[in-house]
Structure formats: C-alpha cells, structure tokens
C-alpha cells in the first residue's frame, strides 16, 4: 500500500538536501520565469484557497524544467502593512517578531505541499537588506520630480489612524477592515503616476492578460478626449475652466457647477448665499471621493448667487456648487447640459433649472437624450452630427481664445504616505531652514527603529514621531532637522519584488542588468483579480520609471497574467469569522499533498470560482492509488509488476498514449489542468484494460503526472530503477502518426442486413476484407444453401454480400 506520509516527507527532504529546484543558469537553455503573487504572511496561515494558484505555477515550472528550460520559480513575503500592525497593537507583540513567526509557519505549510521553489531567492519586504532598494527607488523618483510633497485632500480613516489610497477603498469604506473614510487636507508624499498615464494605457495592448483586468485598468486610468472651455464670471475679472467630452453641446449649457472646495467659491459667492454655501461645504467636507461620485445617488447642491458667461453665445448661466464635482478631477468645474446628460438632467429636474435642447431626438419630458443626432438651436453647428459638431466647436473655441482641445484622465497621483509604524521609513529629512533633502544613498537602508509604543497618533504624524532620538538630526554644519515620520504604504515593496528574485543577494545594486535581461519579462504571473487596479498598476508604474532610469531592460514587468478563481465553502468566501476555513494541513494529513494538489486542479477551470467538496481529495486519492497499483508491485514495493509492464509494444495503447501526451502538454501550457487530468484518467482506464503496458508508455505517463503529483511519481520513478529525481527527466514526446487509428471496424451485411463485424488494419486490400468477411461463423449461417452472387467492398467501412 502507498503511504503518503512517509513518501512525501522522504521526497521533500531529498529535494531540500539536493537543491533540486535551484534556478538553472545553463546558457544553452531557454529561460522561463513562473511567478506567484507572494502572500502577506498573516497569523492565520494558509487555507485551501492559497495553493490553487501556487499549484498551477508549480505544474508549469516542473513541466518547463523537464522540457529543458532554466526555470526561475521563487517565493517571498509581502511582510509590511496594516494587518500585522493591527495584530501587534491588539496583542502588544512586536510586529517584527510576529512577522518572523508567521513566515516560518507559511513556509512550513508551503513545503508540505511539495512546491518546487528556489528558496535561496526568498525575499521579505520588511528586511532592511530588501527595503534599502525600495528606499533607493523612492530617491530616484524624488530626483526625477516624480516624488513630491503636497497639501492634498486625502481619505482619512480614524479607525486605522492613517490615510488610505483611492485604490484601497471599496464601496466607500477601507478595504482592510471596512472602516468609514473621511475627507481632510493633509501634507502627503505623492508619486506622480499621472506622468505615465498614456504609457500605462497604451502598453496594455501588448500584454497577454485577461481582458477584464485590462479593462479595469483602462477605466481606472480613464482617458477621455474633449475640450477645456473658459467661462468668465459676470461682473468680475475671475474665470474658470471646465473640461467636457461634449463641447458640441455648449449652446445647451443652462448652469455650471464648481467643486465645493474650489478657492473660487469663496471669492464669487454673494452675501445673500454665503450662509447656505458655508453650511453646505461643512456638511460634505468629510465625504470621500467615492461617496461623492459613484455611491452618490441623491444629488445635492447650492446656488452661489454668481453667474458665468457662456463664451459661445454670451448668455448668463448660474454657478452652483455640488459634491459630485471633485476638485481633484479635471478642472474641478463642470458645465451642465441637462438635455443631453443624465446626471445634469437629474440635478436640473430636482432644482428646477432650465433644460435646453440642442440635439434632435428623445423625449425630454421623460429623460435626457444622450444619443447621436442633428444639432439644433446651435448656430453654426446646426445640422451637424455629434462628431462633426465636436470638431467644429473645438476649432471655434481655439479661434476665439475661449478654449482648446484637451485630454483628461481619471487617474490620480499615488498617495504614498501612511501615518503608521510598520512600513518602510521614507528616506527624507526636513531641515529647520525649510529645505528638504534625501538620506545619502550610501547611508541606506534608513532602518525602521525599534518601538514599543506603535499606537497611531491620530494626527498627520506616525508613531515614529515619538522616537525623538531617531527623528531629530543635526548635519555637520550644526543645522537641525527632523526625519520624515510617515512610512510608505505596503504596496511599495510589492511593486518591484519580482526584480529582486532575479538577483536577491546583490548589495551593490537593485539587480544586475544582464540578469534582468535574461529573465524579464515574467513569463507567467498567477494571482487574484482583486489586485487589478492596485498592485498590478503600481508595479507597472514602478517598472516604467525603472525602465526610464535604465535599471530594467523591458517596458512591462509581466507578459502573461492569469487570475485563479476563488475556492468557496458553502458558496461563500472562506474566512475565520464565518467558520468555513479548510486548513490544507488537515487535508494533507488525511489524503496527502498530491491528492490535494490534484483535486484543486481537477475541480474545474482554474479561473472559475468553485465550491470546495470535502470528499474531493478522497476521490483524487482513489485515482492516485489506482496509478500506484498499476505501476508498483504491492507485494514488493521496490518492484514493478513484470507481467504487466513490458519492453515490447503490441500497439494497443499507441493511440491513447499519443493523445495523452499531446493533450496534457497543450492543456498544461493553456492552464487547462482539469481537462489534462481527465485525459490522464482516460489513459489509466485504457492501460488497466490492456494486456500489457509498454515500459516507455508507463514511464512517459509518470513524467506527465509528476508535475501534479510529484511525491508519488518520484517514488514510482525510483521503483522503475532511476537513481536521479524525475524533475529533470525529459518531457515525453509522441508520434503524430499514432494519433490516427491503425485499425478500423468493418461491418458485414448479407443482403443489406447487418450480420457481423470485425477489426482490420486500416486501408486493408478489398480482397483481404472480402475473404475475412466470408469466413466469419455468424455470416456463414446466413449464407447456408445460398449462392454468393456479388460482394461489394467499401474500404475501411462495409462488406456487403449479395446471396440468393
């Protein structure tokens, strides 16, 4: 009997002792980089959802090694961040100690699953030797003007005691913990991601990524073409610009709206409206951007008392303020055309503002008309369709110095400051004379000091502000300064970790350029779709900055991306609070790591979300036990069943073996593991029915199954008499000629009625088929006492005997 507990331990020990999965560097071989999104090492450890993506990259890595590639398949830890700090605050433990313990537990769990990681390349984002280079990248951005300080409206979470980025807010609450978010102005470090908006957008087209992820990034970047139009404020020298994607509707403007926080609001509000305006601003000042836009179902606003002049026809239109206009998007002002915009229509209807039709079509009594149509009431645009009218209006605006063609983006610069302890220190010093300087490169890493009190201060400072010995500095000229006390967000270290795996022990540079050239871009990156507009966008941005600096040789980091689905329990996401977490350690103890790996790959398509079945691993174990019994003599576990596995080939399994090698290889490459495993089951069914199994096919099959069930296949490989690991045994090939049936079934009819059938070699001669048909006992019965008048032979199909 196969004992998974002893066999799995044996091979895990063997792989570790022999450095089996050390990254190859044979210059004659091609290179393949298979990457997992590295985990945050939480105290909860792994649940069965984690190994799904990890098993997929492991199968590919193992196949590529067997196909003769140098394979880079590393693992590391996204170790900084809020969850560890929250846990440390709750328990009073040191976050560094907590992190180390969690990593040790995660690593033990991963090794029990038999993943073929090169542990020599392990990285941890909270290790000073690692974050030295995170800080170095920040310094290069600072020198290029891509990292800057600004007083900006931020998403402040009092419960977390820190700012969170737009990308970290889900449905108006913090993604981590689901806490409310409020708007406030704070001094923050920003990274100028907007400088890369066009490239981040355009280069998506070259990537082999799931279309929904690319679409989410396109929408997040939100490029829109239109015009910037200048409105003058009546009886004033003030002006304001609006960005619009519909300059063709300028004749239909019936009011304008400013962002409540716009400085202009205070300057133009009339005395009669001042109280109402101030009251409104106070009411909405703590709302987050999302609450004001996407989640804002009810339109609110106040008239300022001021009017603006429409530049195209000189008409006066009222100036309102409303929370749906953001100071941070576009120009912080909009022109409203209620007849042809749904949001403007709702606002105008609520506040009784005019609705001026300028395009034919629709019923304005019921709703805005947003489609294409002929322009009316629009002077020189009358009769034109939307696109022609847009072009003509932009020409008019430019000719009259009233506006210009403009491209706008929804993307904002990245808010890079966190008011927390457990993150990378920002290597900046603020001097008493008002200047700012970087910590010299040769003094990096700027280490995170040990602190016993890491409670958030509730102010724009992090707990580091309390460590005065660390904060206060004096330069050689006696000038006093203070270190930056905000830390970087946990997205910083994960924005470039895939580069460090390539050269993890380099203390002279982030990574050697020639090595980066050899391995980049990452060939396959597997992880959750929830990272579409955070990690994946941030990493692309950092990579492009590093490309411009000449640090990396490619424009993009990840050539092929794949999102695995969720493994659910009782149709819900697994979580401790729901009590529905399945621990992989328990499954491994009972059924073995190979059974768990195989079940997770066999559940369904890799990108589908599927419900966990507690009996699933038992069924894959049953299949693996069948494989074991077929190839290993149960009485002598070191021998093969000689009478079944032979050196001769009678051809019986030729076709199914060729089909299996072809399908498994192609399906693995396409990440269709469930159908590859189905085909292996087809082969085993055929092999069990066959009189004998050619040794070549038995060994070939073991190589095919090894990436999925590596422990058992290593053991069988050894039973077959091989001394070395199966990991580098050459991947099987097949003879395409054998995909075609070598035998066919011939139907035999007597006077048009089916009376028998037999197997014959494909394309047998007509006379041979006739002879065989006439000799069949069952056919003879129907020919008794009759004369055969004629025999019609259709090769490979039918022999029809006419007898009277």
From Swiss-Prot:
ATP binds at residue 576. Gene3D superfamilies: 3.10.20.590, HUPs, Isoleucyl-tRNA Synthetase, Domain 1. Signal peptide: none annotated. The keyword Nucleotide-binding applies. It is found in: Cytoplasm. It is an enzyme of class 6 (ligase). One of its GO terms (molecular function) is leucine-tRNA ligase activity. Pfam families: Anticodon_1, tRNA-synt_1, tRNA-synt_1_2, tRNA-synt_1g. It catalyses: tRNA(Leu) + L-leucine + ATP = L-leucyl-tRNA(Leu) + AMP + diphosphate. InterPro entries: aa-tRNA-synth_I_CS, aa-tRNA-synth_Ia, Leu-tRNA-ligase, Leu_tRNA-synth_edit, M/V/L/I-tRNA-synth_anticd-bd, Methionyl/Leucyl_tRNA_Synth, Rossmann-like_a/b/a_fold, tRNAsynth_Ia_anticodon-bd. CDD domains: Anticodon_Ia_Leu_BEm, LeuRS_core. NCBIfam families: leuS_bact (TIGR00396). This is Leucine--tRNA ligase. It comes from Lactobacillus gasseri (strain ATCC 33323 / DSM 20243 / BCRC 14619 / CIP 102991 / JCM 1131 / KCTC 3163 / NCIMB 11718 / NCTC 13722 / AM63). The lineage of its organism: Bacteria, Bacillati, Bacillota, Bacilli, Lactobacillales.
